[in-house]
Amino acid sequence: MNYKLFSPYTIKDVTLKNRIVMSPMCMYSSENEDGQVTNFHLVHYGTRAAGQVGLVMIEATAVLPGGRISNKDLGIWDDSLIEGLHKTTTFIHDNGAKAAIQLAHAGRKAELETDALAPSAVPFNETMKTPVEMSKHQIKDTVLAFQQAAIRSKQAGFDVIEIHGAHGYLINEFLSPLSNKRTDEYGGSPENRYRFLREIIDSINEVWNGPLFVRISANDYHPDGLTVQDYVQYTKWMKEQGVDLIDCSSGAVVPARIDVYPGYQVQYAKHIKEHANIATGAVGLITTGAQAEQILTNNEADLIFIGRELLRNPYFPRIAANELGFELEEPYQYERAPGKISTNK
């Protein structure tokens, strides 16, 4: 029997062998605090590729040193960082998966000794420091940093770029009226709050012609914040700019209580897919093959982003295949393992 979860998916000239994506998750493991890839990253991402994930997405990678969440985040702000990232993509490709990178700036959530930058001088909560409102010059420099990061991503061998526009980091801070109190052309109306992201997408499109994703937080979980309907308009603009897929997460732009349950964010992927007519990825407490397959067969999303479940078990695709009774291709080195479900050599 054929399963959609294990069917190929093509975006532009990149074909994923299945619909399983390793969701980007910060590992805080650049031990020398220089943004460099370490041996841990090679093993961490290479193992998920060997486990038959279709697309392995590298964690949020800072486009500027001051855009890191912590000093131990990965970086892509300098050419010296390309070599380590290229080793990582080579590991991933050698094990049969495609490689993606999430480009990010932490904004007011940067927990560094230096000043945190944000659209407005509004702290995330009472315990975090008040950020510095970005000048227009700093905005332009950050847009350029995303463009240069895209160039380096191409040089490092990535197949897909994702822009991190979610979870209360810098781009999300510009999009939400809860964190953006500006009165210039970057604040106020939805069009103005979108301007920063628009400029980033345009700048990346000048140097990158591969698949482009954007991760969003489709619900601020606040009465004065954004809802998924607001993001329908944002994602329509993204589609007009050539974005290929929306990775639909939620929350974290302000402190909020969120009731989580299995697949609690799938509704956002479905809503954006239906109302913005753009491909989406579903993420959030998706833990079984049957659950993932149902999301795809119900046409609620196009890709399945798996996070913590892949931390618990890097061979989740094999477990999902066994659960569904599907014969998944496996590395020939593992064929002697008990419970193998393929005889490919």
Curated annotation (Swiss-Prot):
Its EC number is 1.6.99.1. Substrate binds at Y28, H164, G165, A166, H167. Transmembrane segments: none annotated. One of its GO terms (biological process) is response to toxic substance. The keyword Phosphoprotein does not apply. It is an enzyme of class 1 (oxidoreductase). Keywords: Detoxification, Flavoprotein, FMN, NADP, Oxidoreductase. It catalyses: A + NADPH + H(+) = AH2 + NADP(+). One of its GO terms (molecular function) is NADP binding. Its cofactor is FMN. FMN binds at S23, P24, M25, C26, A60, Q102, R215, G307, R308. InterPro entries: Aldolase_TIM (IPR013785), NADPH_DH_bac (IPR023663), OxRdtase_FMN_N (IPR001155), YqjM-like (IPR044152). Gene3D superfamilies: Aldolase class I. The keyword tRNA-binding does not apply. Homotetramer. Belongs to the NADH:flavin oxidoreductase/NADH oxidase family. NamA subfamily. Catalyzes the reduction of the double bond of an array of alpha,beta-unsaturated aldehydes and ketones. It also reduces the nitro group of nitroester and nitroaromatic compounds. It could have a role in detoxification processes. This is NADPH dehydrogenase. The lineage of its organism: Bacteria, Bacillati, Bacillota, Bacilli, Bacillales.
